[in-house]
Amino acid sequence: VLVDAPCSGLGSPRRRPGARWRRTAKDVNELAELQRELLTSALATVRPGGVVAYTTCSPHVLETEYVVRDVTRRLDRRGQRVEVLHAGNAATRLAPRPPAGAERRMLQLWPHLEGTDAMFCALLRRVD
């Protein structure tokens, strides 16, 4: 299941140069809450053993790593196990050259390093 979450767009300045001036802290917080809801719903929908790819075009930790952390902690407290797979390893196998930060479980691409938007990807497997 792919969750290509609506985000602030802060990671795509080439395509949306004004995004950083139009977004407020409140916008980012509201988007992060929506992102947590979407990721939680996707993990509830996928069968045990299934994988959810959570992606955004934002480099903001409130929309990326914190969303994954918050959702996995919340589900863990409910007794639902989710494993964060190694997205960096997956990207290394698929890309013509390893992206910067490929050693990390959650992958953050940067425009100045990869020539892409600031894309984020986390792969989560529902354990039970």
Feature locations, PLM:
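Mobile active-site "lid"/loop adjacent to the S-adenosyl-L-methionine
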Residues: D4-S41, R47, A53, S58-E63
